[in-house]
A protein has these predicted regions:
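Short C-terminal tail/terminal secondary-structure segment
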Residues: 2-7, 247-248, 259-275
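C-terminal helical subdomain
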Residues: 126, 130-133, 199, 220-254, ...
Length: 275
């Protein structure tokens, strides 16, 4: 056992990459990993250089890289550049994802009229781009690490409790949770027993993708937002920083015997029966 419990949570000397790293949740995760000692690659389709510059200005180790998680060729090119600079990747956080209005039911758009294109985009972004493709490309390098590593997918509370209005997103995130368990077993049994794969299932966090569902134009809770708060024992939406502790735990040696799990970070939403 390590001499100091703090050392078990330290990421000193480790290299981490985060897809969707310039987004609201991704940037918070990048900052947390860097504060724990990791050198962080911020991978995104835009704003990656600005995000990296912000962390560097805070005295942290970060670099930005372009990635399009929907294109395997672009992911491979990104991984090539990352490996040239980092030499090794110890931690992969698959944080890219989101929902789209055209895959969301509403009074104007019923389930029967949801366009296939919108549903396909949401599934592609959250399942293929949000988990499978980056894990294929970066995982191929990570299985070579003698000390293993950690892949962390971002699932959702929707994977446990499918929510109204967002069928594509709920289905995709349920698939991410299932894929997480599958990949954990596959990597451990076929390639490297020290390479772990887990997922975090956030509850309700305000992001650009879901804000229109939860907050109205007057910055008040929508009926849907009110219902969520009433069913969240913590009594609030999640803050991006609320994901950091769980992410560092899963990335560090402190969770070295943990693989194939999906950890809720939801303020108690999943545990509350409503009465």
């Amino acid at each position: 056992m390590e001499k100091n419990i703090i050392e078990m949570f330290s990421l000193d000397g480790m290299n981490a990459v985060v897809t969707g790293g310039a987004g609201v949740l991704g940037m918070s995760i990048c900052r947390g990993l860097a504060q724990a000692g990791a050198r962080v690659g911020i991978l995104d389709i835009k704003n990656f250089d600005e995000a990296a510059a912000q962390l560097v200005s805070e005295g942290l180790k970060a670099e930005g890289f372009y990635i399009d998680v929907l294109k395997k060729e672009a992911i491979s090119e990104c991984a090539k550049k990352v490996m040239e600079q980092f030499k090794r990747v110890d931690i992969l956080v698959n944080c890219a994802g989101g929902n789209l209005k055209e895959a969301t039911t509403s009074p104007q758009l019923s389930f029967f009229d949801l366009p296939l294109e919108g549903l396909e985009k949401v599934v592609a972004l959250n399942l293929f781009g949000g988990a499978i493709l980056p894990s294929q490309v970066f995982g191929k390098e990570m299985v070579k690490n003698p000390e293993g590593g950690s892949i962390i997918n971002i699932s959702s509370m929707n994977a446990f409790r499918p929510l109204t209005r967002i069928p594509g997103y709920s289905a995709a995130k349920a698939a991410v949770s299932n894929f997480t368990q599958w990949l954990a077993v596959h990597f451990a049994m076929e390639y490297n027993k020290l390479l772990r794969v887990n997922a975090i299932a956030p509850g309700f966090f305000l992001t650009q993708q879901n804000r229109y569902l939860l907050i109205d134009e007057n910055n008040n809770l929508t009926p849907r937002g009110q219902t969520i708060i009433q069913h969240t024992p913590a009594g609030r939406f999640g803050h991006p920083d609320d994901l950091i502790g769980t992410c560092i735990w899963l990335a560090s040696k402190s969770s070295r015997f943990v693989t194939g799990v999906v950890v809720p970070v939801d303020g108690g939403f999943n545990a509350f029966s409503g009465v």
